[in-house]
A protein has these predicted regions:
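Hydrophobic, aromatic-rich transmembrane alpha-helices
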Residues: 15, 19, 109-113, 206-216, ...
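Specific aromatic-rich, kink-prone transmembrane helix
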Residues: 111, 131, 150-170, 178-184, ...
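Membrane-lumen/periplasm interface segments of multi-pass, membrane-embedded glycan/lipid transferases
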Residues: 38, 49-51, 55-72, 247-317, ...
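Hydrophobic/aromatic-rich transmembrane helices and adjacent perimembrane loops
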Residues: 150, 190-192, 196-199, 295-299, ...
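Membrane-embedded, lumen/periplasm-facing catalytic core of multi-pass transferases
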Residues: 31-37, 401-450, 456-497, 512-533
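Signature aromatic-anchored transmembrane alpha helix within multi-pass, membrane-resident enzymes
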Residues: 10-18, 122-128, 175-182, 202, ...
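Transmembrane-helix motifs of polytopic, lipid-linked glycan transferases
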Residues: 96-120, 157, 161
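Short acidic/glycine- and proline-prone juxtamembrane loop motifs at membrane-interface regions
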Residues: 69, 143-150, 463
Length: 533
């Protein structure tokens, strides 16, 4: 495939996209704390912020200041803990975390450029960069301070290292096992469930290497057994280090959040599994499509996109060696996505409430898919149109149009306000002003309340509590009312009750002022209503 624009020109445009996006997202911080609290940050973000802050002050990993916890993703928590060590106030920690997230979004363009440089495809770089802008700029998933931005950066790096590895294999050069292994370890450290994708990618890369020696496997083992063994030991060390860190933080090898999210995993019916598979497929597609098309259309779009890439890969004979290697990697990503989706669908894990925010690998897969389709379409048009200006400016124009759409969607969503978050923010400030410092609260959604109230808030959904609570209350027979009395809880604060509790009196209400008619209630806990003697 011939190139139509110099790589330097494409790189300049992509750097502009990255800088403009970073400036736009950082400008959100000028709107102040209340805007960040009610328009950007989800409740789970405060689980990281409050836990890192308490770890700094108390010397152990705890959200509520009472119970040790490991309900975090390792790499993002380490980063926020380091930020907490540097921050003088919780407000500075919050804004710094958001700024780091925005910086990570921008750094993704660096690895997009590295991928395109290896592939010698500046046009592909333009398409991938503009589609990444459309995903990461207008939608809150990459401006909420969670590990999504870090995961995206790490996964783009995984794509880069995997591409380099496969191209070197294809050229019969010595592949870099160590670079690939390190980024795959970081991928698992960023999201524990991404260990599955890391395993699939490493196995695929080794398999492709072995395939080149298919006529002399003995030479394959002689040449690469030490590197494969060393990489496997390094990966094992990375896993042991991760599990050891979780064990030291909170008395279990797996994070308590992972135990809870998978505790109800059971074999569902075939119909339920198919419905869930469709749900997961759609949730992993680009956010710009969500809510704009009915489910059958989205499924058809996804299947059609995959088939188009497969058809182009098979039918177009003049692919460069680099693009062929990239298509092999795309096939591996497709396999990894399929395995992950089928596992979640068949296991019965509740995907929507727990995993809905953590879809960076899926987003990146679809960005690559769309970019390959755009590249192949452009190359086909070039065969029938011989205008030099078209060859040079059409990809640039397309990428800038996509960028303009991203800014337009961002501008329309900038004034979004969650009435739930606003009411919870007001409740937290009221608690800070109207309760003694030693008051103990509890909530199923404790993040925002605990962070802004500066009071002890025990997490009742268990995701950022300790393993003892999971084993005794959530999975065991200890009534929640007894646990509340045992931990000297004075009040429960939430907009909904997720476990059976006695008829505690409501002492304060904060209406959400939405169509649901819900309110955040403050219940006063009474020891007389527990079953404890």
């Amino acid at each position: 495939m011939s190139q139509s624009i110099p790589f330097r020109q494409a790189a300049f445009i992509i750097v502009i996209l990255a800088v403009v996006q970073f400036i736009i997202q950082v400008s959100l911080l000028t709107k102040g704390m209340e805007y960040a609290a009610v328009s950007l940050i989800i409740d789970d973000t405060y689980y990281y912020l409050q836990t890192a802050w308490n770890a700094k002050l108390l010397g152990f990993v705890t959200f509520d200041g009472l119970h040790a916890t490991n309900g975090v993703q390792l790499l993002w928590f380490v980063i926020i803990f380091l930020l907490a060590k540097l921050a003088k106030t919780k407000a500075i920690l919050l804004f710094t975390t958001l700024a780091v997230s925005f910086l990570l979004n921008g750094l993704c363009y660096l690895f997009i450029l590295r991928i395109a440089a290896v592939l010698k495809q500046p046009i592909l770089a333009l398409f991938m960069a503009s589609l990444w802008t459309l995903q990461s700029l207008p939608f809150r998933i990459y401006s909420m301070g969670m590990e999504n931005s870090l995961h995206a950066l790490v996964f783009w790096c995984v794509i880069w290292q995997s591409t380099v590895f496969l191209i070197r294999v294809q050229n019969r050069d010595k592949p870099n096992f160590w670079g690939l292994t390190v980024v795959l370890i970081l991928n698992a450290w960023t999201r524990l469930d991404s260990a599955l994708l890391s395993t699939v990618l490493f196995t695929f890369c080794v398999g492709m290497l072995a395939y080149t020696y298919r006529h002399n496997l003995r030479l394959f083992f002689q040449s690469h057994s030490k590197a494969i063994t060393g990489s496997s030991f390094l990966a094992g060390f990375g896993l042991i280090a991760q599990l050891t860190a979780f064990r030291l933080m909170g008395d279990s090898l797996l994070p308590v959040s992972a135990l809870i999210k998978t505790s109800d995993a059971v074999q569902g019916s075939n119909i339920e599994s198919i419905d869930k598979l469709v749900e997961i497929l759609i949730l992993g597609m680009p956010s710009i499509l969500h809510g704009r098309f009915p489910t059958p259309i989205l499924v058809l779009l996804g299947i059609s996109g995959i088939l188009l890439v497969i058809l182009a890969g098979v039918s177009i004979r003049d692919h460069s060696d680099e693009i062929r290697a990239f298509l092999n990697l795309w096939s591996c990503l497709l396999l990894g996505e399929a395995i992950y989706h089928v596992y979640v669908a068949l296991s019965g894990v509740e995907y929507s409430p727990y995993f809905i925010w953590y879809r960076s690998p899926s987003f990146i897969f679809w960005i690559i898919t769309g970019s390959l389709i755009a590249l192949f379409t452009f190359e086909h048009i070039k065969l029938v149109m011989h205008s030099i200006n078209f060859h040079k400016w059409a990809p640039v124009g397309c990428s800038l149009i996509i960028f303009a759409v991203a800014i337009y969607v961002f501008a329309r969503s900038i004034n979004f306000t969650s009435k739930l978050y606003a009411a919870r923010y007001d409740a937290a400030l009221w608690i800070a002003e109207n309760s003694p410092p030693d008051t103990v609260f509890a909530s199923w959604n404790a993040g925002q309340l605990g962070f802004f109230s500066n009071r002890t808030f025990i997490n009742l959904d268990g995701l950022i509590n300790n393993v003892d609570y999971y084993e005794r209350v959530l999975k065991g027979s200890v009534p929640l009312a007894d646990y509340l009395v045992e931990n000297k809880v004075d009040y429960i604060v939430d907009y909904s009750i997720y476990h059976s509790i006695p008829d505690y009196p409501v002492v304060r209400t904060f209406p959400l002022n939405d169509e649901t008619g819900r309110s955040i209630h403050i219940w006063q806990v009474s020891s007389q209503l527990s079953s404890a003697p």
